[in-house]
Regions:
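Charged, often Cys/His-bearing segments associated with DNA-binding zinc-finger transcription factors
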Residues: 1-67
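Short acidic-aromatic active-site loops that bind/stabilize oxyanions
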Residues: 42-46, 71, 271, 275
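Short, well-ordered secondary-structure "scaffold" segments embedded in the functional core
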Residues: 90-94, 98-345
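A structural signal for short hydrophobic/aromatic patches embedded in well-ordered alpha helices
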Residues: 55-56, 81, 140
Length: 345
């Protein structure tokens, strides 16, 4: 009984501390304008430049909902907090301590969920598109032929793993054991397809880490589309994949055993060089948005983790559109997680 007053005092003290931190963070936010940061520091902190970030906010804000409370965070801060998290990958601690954002970790988490879903729902359908018309296919083929001398390629395909925390054991729709990949960690196996300029043409983050690259492609709408196009007479368009995929009329992969100096060896060499963009795409994507990099575990349920992956992939294409280059030393190098030769991580 004697401990009750102490306990009550502790609760009051904790409430007072929370109120103080809430007021402090608001005062800190009000006193600083992130858009007054030097451009180099802004890009380092938020991974996009200031002009592109403003454009992103303009695209999303009309769909962000009404601010019902004066204490509610301005939408631009929610976007900045999301960009900072995507770029750092250190969960919410570094974001919460960023004085330019000055938000609590729960607020960061809510903002991340909100903004990633907005980007996925509104922008991803416009910015990540697989070629379907002859004009689109011809343009992509021209890029591959000009760079690598390989005819007919309309994309490079591979899988890349993004680590996540163990899903709840009670989640019957996402049983933890199916997310354990070949490296023994829980992950999502993401199917990526890109063009010769590292633009992402397709991104599928629905499958757990135990699912093979080829199995994901086999049930994809893209494979079904390629098969139907082939059956309707388009026999000059194909994807480029590694040995983790099966050879198909619309998917070229390496020939397993070839004689030195043979045409088959030359084909394998040309195929390998033509696959370079998918490795580079993965490196740029994870280098810019380091929450996806190997060993930076996403502490989210698989569904929310997928939204983060989709948002980062969409922003990757938007950054390419804006010619926002990434320093070579920032490009991630991962080569030990895939299912085939020269696998992307």
């Amino acid at each position: 009984i004697n401990n009750i007053p102490v306990f009550i005092y502790g609760l009051l003290e904790e409430d007072e501390r929370r109120n103080y931190m809430r007021i402090y963070r608001k005062q800190l936010r009000d006193s600083q304008n992130p858009f007054e940061m030097p451009e180099v520091e802004f890009i380092k902190t938020f991974r996009l430049n200031q002009d592109l970030t403003r454009i992103l906010i303009e695209w999303l804000e009309p769909h962000a909902g009404i601010r019902r409370r004066t204490t509610k965070l301005p939408f631009y801060l929610e976007v900045l907090a999301t960009l900072n998290f995507l770029g750092t990958g250190s969960y919410q601690h570094s974001v919460g301590s960023c004085t330019w954002v000055a938000m609590s970790q729960p607020a960061i988490s809510r903002s991340l969920k909100k903004v990633c879903r907005l980007v996925t729902g509104l922008l991803m359908p416009e910015w990540i598109k697989f070629p379907t018309t002859m004009e689109e296919k011809t343009a992509i083929k021209g890029g591959f032929y000009e760079k690598f001398g390989f005819r007919g390629a309309i994309g490079c395909i591979d899988g890349t793993h993004v680590e996540i925390i163990t899903p709840p054991i009670t989640d019957v729709d996402h049983p933890p054991h199916v997310y354990i990949d070949r490296n023994g960690v829980h992950s999502i196996n993401v199917m990526l397809i890109c063009d010769s300029n590292c633009k992402i043409l397709a991104c599928d983050a629905r499958f757990p880490g135990s699912v093979h690259d080829s199995a994901i492609f086999r049930v994809s709408d893209i494979r079904n589309n390629l098969r139907m196009c082939f059956e309707n007479g388009d026999d000059t368009s194909w994807l480029i994949g590694d040995s983790g995929y099966g050879q198909e009329p619309w998917l070229f992969t390496p020939i397993p055993v070839v004689a030195p100096g043979s045409p088959q060896e030359r084909y394998n060499q040309l195929l390998r060089s033509t696959r370079n963009p998918i490795e580079r795409t993965n490196g740029i994507l994870k280098g810019r948005f380091r929450c996806l990099i190997k060993h930076r575990v996403l502490h989210f349920h698989p569904v929310q983790a997928a939204y983060i992956i989709y948002a980062a992939s969409t922003l990757h294409n938007i950054a390419l559109w804006a010619n926002l280059a990434l320093d070579e030393d920032e490009i991630a190098v991962e080569n030990d997680e895939g299912n085939g030769d020269n696998a992307v991580g």
